[in-house]
Amino acid sequence: MIIKKVRTQFGVEAEVWKLGYISLDRVAKYGSITMNLYFTEDAEQYIDSKTQLIPEEKFDEYFESGGDLFENCERFMLENCYLFMEDGATHLNVY
């Protein structure tokens, strides 16, 4: 889970981002990660999402070096997705 406060299209702030979808092609070395935004940690429905493509040159670093897949996905998003690279994003290890 990533905590990053953003203003939603409804004009209110939300900050809980959870992994929504992971697509990895280990043969072609590419994929994508989608993070979903929730008002609270316990909310059942997300209100927004952000998808980041995984370029071939970054694939092995994050997805062929071992470790927990979910943690690697969140680390990739924190280090490569502009939204989360801005000040204020925090990774919460919940796995």
Regions found by a protein language model. Name each.
Residues 1-95:
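Viral virion structural and adsorption modules
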